[in-house]
Amino acid sequence: MCVAALSGAFTFYNIMPWNEGREEESARDMVEYVERTGNPICLYSLPMHAEGRPAMTRAMRMIESYRKVRRLVEGTPVKLGVLLQSTLGHWSRVDREIEPWQRTVRIDGTEARFCPLDPGFQNYIREAVRLLAAEKPVMIMGDDDIRGYSGGKLECFCPLHVKAFNKANGTHFTSEQLREAVENGKEGDPILEAFVRLHRKTVCDFARLIRAAIDSVDPAIPAAACMPGMAWEQKWSPLTAKALAAKGQEPILRMGNSQYGEILHNFSELTSRSLRTMAFFSLHGDGMCLLDESDSFPQNQWSKSGTTLHSKLVSSIFLGARGSKIWYVNAHKSGGIPVSRVYTDVLARFRGFYPALAEAVKGTDPAGVISPAHPRFPLGAGAMCDTHTLADGIFGTMGIPYRCDVHLERDGAYVLSGEMAVEGFSDAELDLMLSHRILVDADAAVALTKRGFSGKTGVSAAFDPSLKFKEDYFDAGGFPMYFTAVRKPAARFDCAAGVEEFSHLVFVDPETGKRDPVTPSGVKFANSLGGTVVTVAYSTEQYWAYLHSEQRRDYFHYVLGLLGPDALGYALMNPQPAQCLARRGKERDLVAVFNFCPDPMRSVLLKCPVRPKSVRRLGDDGVWKPCAFREIGAGVFEIDDEIPCCGAPVYRIDSGMAY
């Protein structure tokens, strides 16, 4: 069973709020939503975490509300399902009356949610899910509280878990002792690894309990999971999705890639969300239907934008998403307050666009410089990929395509940016990357020097507080750029024999104007591993104004060119902040442009690796429409298409003669 069979090539799961006493209003909202958008699936959101005593009293109120809505939408196009919005619960329990079940104990010793090992709590969840399954929902989706932490703190160290841990490992820990051992454990520590196994088993067993309750009624009902926000659970959240899936059903997992705030000043954060989405696809994309976590939750009137909701959807579908979990579109919140219908308008306008884009992505592969992802990081810390680095922070706003990959053996041009990125990789992984073609920034160069890799980069790098100069790359046919060190000093390079220097930090004599080189700021080195390493004295930990300029963009075009003709590929040449994503195929290429500037792009200036035969833009209705274009420079083409602020057009480029 494939998720596409539920709705189409791209499936929306619209979460509708529990609306006790206003079920007729909810049913009308759902019918209107389906008729306008063509998206039939609505999941009624039920916060099933146990509250009150007996907890089933509140649960039965929600189940009865679901039954009323189900009866009201019978005979309509609505396909009704359930979001188990909270089972374990997102937060600590604060009820006045509470069931006498075991509470989870977090790593700081505080109590939080009900423990999934408690038999009474298990019986409650089993019965509630069984009753919901009897209503024949089209889908049951578990929310992201099915996880092993709450409030950002690791669980569980309660008496039930400590007993299970000691029995499995032949130990005699108390809760306090186990918490201390886990908190101080390092990678490879047998106690830490044993706890991680129990931690994972607890979450997966809870998902299996839900699946078993569904199966006791109807094994054919599909179910899905939502990825939690903590990176160390994101690594193995596909296991939860597999545990929830029906037999023969493709596992469905909503990614944790939302920014939850659609207003303009957050829009450029789309680059870091794009990078994270790329990492999820690289790590979990095979055999898993990944859904976008879309930014439609209506927090308040200052955070709503259907335009940027659409742009986020475009980026995720372009990267491979096959569905989306959206919140409260066309609904009413508590008190009868209508959710902004701008979300409905956008989904109605683009109802043909989203499935057409999902179909077009098939048969193409992500293109651009590779930012490596690392699934190895400490329990409770780190992330699969570092953000606000050269890839998403600089290239993502300079129109230079990038991608993220966890498979470091893959050939291509890499970029290693930031000290934390280096710390996340083993020596063997760093060797593998340095055997490719790779761009290294100042922070990564200093970190590699500390790790003993200077012999493989050709550079011994250290930050030098005395360096605050202009930067020259006249030798590369360029021009001077201002180089400032407000937040972090520049890096000084001591270069090995055989290193090619192509730019320098220079001191400008105040009397003569003579430019004297102080240290190389851009070097190229062919190492013993067979790799080509280009290192630049450029840190991303500076002010935005000093990080971005047309000169700096041209500099990086030149630098990437040193890594081979395929390192750059497509690139946006407009003099304003924008993200450019690219995919390459045998017969066609796809390019998506995201305008981050409040000013429109009057036309699209696109550097192309080959001369286009034709350029088409995907219309709102899902039909590819031809665009006029002309060559304005070597390999640069002007496409007659205006992009408004936050616009996100997708172009299909059919290629002809290569340059």
Where do the language-model regions lie?
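Aromatic-lined substrate-binding rim segments of carbohydrate-active enzymes
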Residues: M30-V31, P47-E99, I210
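Short, acidic/polar
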Residues: N19-E35, P119-L132, W236-A243, S305-S316
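Hydrophobic targeting/anchoring helices
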Residues: T37, S45-L46, Y149, V217-L390, ...
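Catalytic domains of carbohydrate-active enzymes, especially glycoside hydrolases
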Residues: E24-E51, L131-M139, P251-I252, S311-G323, ...
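Active-site-adjacent "subsite" loops/lids of carbohydrate-active enzymes
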Residues: E64, K79-E135, D144, G148, ...
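A conserved amphipathic helix/loop scaffold
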Residues: T387, D392-G393, V406-H407, V415-Y659
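The substrate-binding groove and active-site-proximal loops of carbohydrate-active enzymes
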Residues: A9-R22, M48-I63, I107-R126, G188-C204, ...
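Aromatic-lined carbohydrate-recognition surfaces of secreted/lumenal glycan-active proteins
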Residues: L6-E20, K79-T87, M141-D145, L192-S237, ...
